[in-house]
A protein has these predicted regions:
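Short coil/turn connectors between adjacent alpha-helices in alpha-solenoid helical repeat scaffolds
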Residues: 57-79, 112-125, 156-172, 202-223, ...
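An active-site-proximal "capping" alpha-helix that borders the catalytic cofactor pocket
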Residues: 446-456, 521-534, 596-612
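Classical Sec-dependent N-terminal signal peptides that target proteins to the secretory pathway
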Residues: 1-26
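Histidine/acidic-rich helix-loop-helix segments that form or flank divalent-metal centers
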Residues: 247-250, 467-493, 533-577, 591-595, ...
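Flexible helix-coil transition and linker loops at the boundaries of alpha-helical arrays
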Residues: 85-102, 132-145, 179-191, 225-250, ...
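Acidic/His-rich, divalent-metal-binding segments that scaffold phosphate/diphosphate chemistry
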Residues: 392-520
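N-terminal leader/linker segments that initiate helical-solenoid repeat arrays
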Residues: 23-110
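"A position-specific structural signal for the A-helix of alpha-solenoid helical repeats
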Residues: 40, 103-114, 144, 150-158, ...
Length: 656
């Protein structure tokens, strides 16, 4: 009996020893992972990335700028390798999933959430949160599960905005589930972050573009409105609740934004908004906006003052919608508000609102009958000049959320661009969209300069390849109108990456490598750009180049929906594909374009007849002057050219 007991005791001790050893190894692995240090380093590297980009904005001599940029690019390579290694270690630890403790998942959630607020790196956030989500689902830790689903939904929504629209419906599932839980339990939240997330969820769920996409009923929309009202009253009327004032203020602002968005939503489609409940709801918000106008008329603080003016603008829109104002009355009122607000000393915080006011005023200007076309054009040109000023200022405001959406909305709004000729509309796209991002604009201009020489040789030596384009059917006509061919190709080169501007948060991401999903998503810049370039017949001429410049000579490549082989502009598309490839500065990571110029030349020669037009490749390699000049532009002169581009891009308004 004693022997049995002794043996059993030894067995227990051996098990305990093994357990202690295992616990020790787990603790050691956790300490080695050191999430605090890793995320602190990731944050510093991200900020260093931005800081080094910001240094490019400064006025400095050319040689100094080139030296700084060379150091920057080398530093970014080091940072990227360092961050990739740290992220691999984090993923490997949580991917194992064995005996990871609750507090370790809590730490991951906290660190990722903080990092997302700073960087808006949606892909990395979604990937890392996906390792914590199953744990909270299994353990029924509902508040942490709520936070996970909230962050996941917000990150997926951002991914959807960059072009992967199918992700929005995944995001919607997470956000609705989190919002439903948050509304039921917000009085019991233990963490301040949870209050921050619930307000952000309402803010996102009630954005007008998502209201329209989901085609919600008025009842569903109004139910969410009532929920937000309850939350706002409780957060701002509970003296025992000690919360960051910014969270309370955001909730109150979101409450206003919700009212604003609902009114915009109701006014967007007259045909569906004739029912009695809708009219009653419109009347309610009409009265509320009148009250808000009175309440906020004496506010002078910039952000609140902008809110009051936004409410007042919508008030005049509602007056017209309900038949109480003529288009002229609403236009004059909105224009007056806009003119007073644009004189604000610091317009950066209200730039998005100002662009929105121009869009609203342009609508009433277009439909009013009291003004002559000359008077309308005078207002429109004034607005255009203001927009150019705002976009210049925006170049020094890094990644202002929503700015690109607002610029794209006004550029593609027929009530705004109807006043302008083809050249003016081209100016709109160049200054308001293409110039909204420095790196993409720099790449487009480099492609343009390389392409100009390519087109010059093509016209001179092989004009027959261009016969039949632009209405000129003979070689003689092509030679006689070479300026038109140059201009056409110049516009095609400038606009070819138009769709990348929406994706600039991803294309400008240098502190880590892109995932395969991100590389795949970047291909969406082709249909996105094609949709924007199709705003009118003038720009639609460049549709084939915008959507087809990654299509191969043999018909392969992407997108599948575009048939390059049968395109009437095939020779232009083929020439642009070669020019874009040789520049190589902003090509898609998934395409594996080598950084070394000689390596690119090797690929160009090897893939003639499959990826590249063999006749154009032969023309390029057999023309010594073109070959030499292109090498200069792509190598030793490239940094000098980039300096000139950045100088024009940023410094034109630094002295103002």
């Amino acid at each position: 009996m004693r022997r049995t007991f002794f043996t059993f005791l030894l067995f227990i001790i051996s098990l305990s020893g093994g357990q202690f050893t295992y616990c020790f190894s787990q603790t050691s692995a956790w300490k080695k992972l050191d999430l605090d240090r890793k995320f602190e380093k990731l944050q510093k590297n991200y900020e260093l990335d931005l800081l080094m980009e910001d240094s490019l904005y400064m006025s400095m001599p050319q040689e100094e700028w080139i030296a700084v940029n060379d150091r920057r690019e080398k530093m970014l390579d080091i940072i990227k390798r360092e961050d990739d290694k740290m992220l691999d270690e984090i993923v490997s630890y949580y991917k194992s999933g064995s005996n990871i403790q609750a507090y370790q998942y809590d730490t991951l959630l906290s660190k990722v959430s903080q990092f997302y607020r700073l960087t808006q790196d949606a892909f990395l956030t979604e990937h890392l949160i996906s390792y914590a989500l199953p744990f909270y689902e299994k353990t029924k830790d509902l508040e942490h599960l709520f936070q996970c689903e909230a962050v996941m939904g917000l990150a997926l929504t951002q991914i959807a905005r960059e072009g992967d629209t199918k992700e929005y419906f995944n995001a919607l599932e997470y956000m609705n589930r989190a919002t439903d839980y948050g509304y039921k339990h917000y009085m019991d939240f233990r963490y301040e972050d949870s209050y921050d997330y619930i307000t952000r969820l309402y803010q996102e769920l009630l954005h007008p573009r998502w209201l329209e996409l989901r085609k919600q009923t008025i009842t569903e929309v109004y139910d969410r409105y009532c929920e937000l009202k309850d939350l706002d009253v409780w957060l701002n009327g509970n003296p025992q609740l000690t919360l960051n004032e910014n969270i309370k203020k955001r909730t109150n602002t979101t409450y206003f934004d919700f009212e604003y968005n609902i009114v915009e939503y109701l006014m967007s489609d007259r045909s569906q908004n004739q029912s009695n409940p809708v009219i009653k709801l419109m009347t309610k918000f009409y009265k509320r906006h009148h009250e808000l106008k009175v309440e906020l008329q004496n506010i002078t603080q910039t952000d609140d003052y902008s809110i009051s003016k936004k409410a007042e603008v919508q008030y005049y829109k509602v007056l017209h919608y309900t038949g109480l104002n003529t288009p002229l009355q609403s236009f004059l009122s909105i224009d007056s508000i806009y003119q007073s607000l644009k004189c604000t000393d610091d317009i950066a915080p209200i730039m998005i609102d100002l662009i929105g006011f121009i869009k609203d005023a342009s609508y009433y200007l277009d439909i009013t009958e009291e003004f002559s076309e000359q008077e309308k054009e005078k207002y429109a040109l004034s607005y255009l000049q203001d927009l150019k000023t705002y976009t210049k200022k925006a170049r020094t405001v890094r990644r202002q959320s929503g700015l690109y959406d607002q610029l794209e909305a006004i550029v593609t709004d027929p009530h705004f661009y109807a006043r302008f000729s083809g050249d003016d509309r081209n100016d709109l796209i160049l200054n308001l969209i293409i110039k909204s991002d420095a790196e993409i604009y720099s790449h487009s201009m480099l492609v343009t300069w390389i392409g100009w020489n390519m087109m010059d040789v093509l016209i001179t030596e092989k004009p027959a390849l261009l016969a039949g384009l632009l209405g000129y059917n003979t070689q003689k006509q092509v030679l006689a109108h070479n300026d038109e061919f140059h201009e056409f190709f110049w516009n095609a080169c400038v606009t070819h990456d138009l769709g990348l501007n929406r994706m600039s948060p991803t294309t400008n991401l240098h502190y880590r490598s892109l995932s395969s999903h991100e590389c795949q998503l970047l291909r969406n810049h082709l249909p996105l750009g094609a949709a924007t370039i199709s705003i009118d017949t003038y720009h639609a001429r460049f549709f084939d180049q915008v959507i087809g410049h990654h299509k191969w000579y043999n018909g392969k490549g992407f997108p599948d929906s575009f048939d390059n082989v049968n395109s009437q502009y095939r020779i232009i598309n083929d020439l642009l594909a070669i020019t874009d490839f040789l520049e190589g500065g902003a090509d898609l990571p998934a395409e594996g374009v080598p950084a070394d110029y000689d390596e690119r030349l090797k690929i160009l020669k090897e893939q003639a007849g499959t990826r590249f037009n063999p006749e154009l490749v032969n023309m390029f390699f057999n023309h010594y002057g073109l070959l030499t000049r292109t090498r200069e532009l792509c190598t030793k002169e490239k940094q000098q050219l980039r300096y000139e581009i950045y100088k024009e891009y940023f410094n034109e308004n630094l002295s103002k």
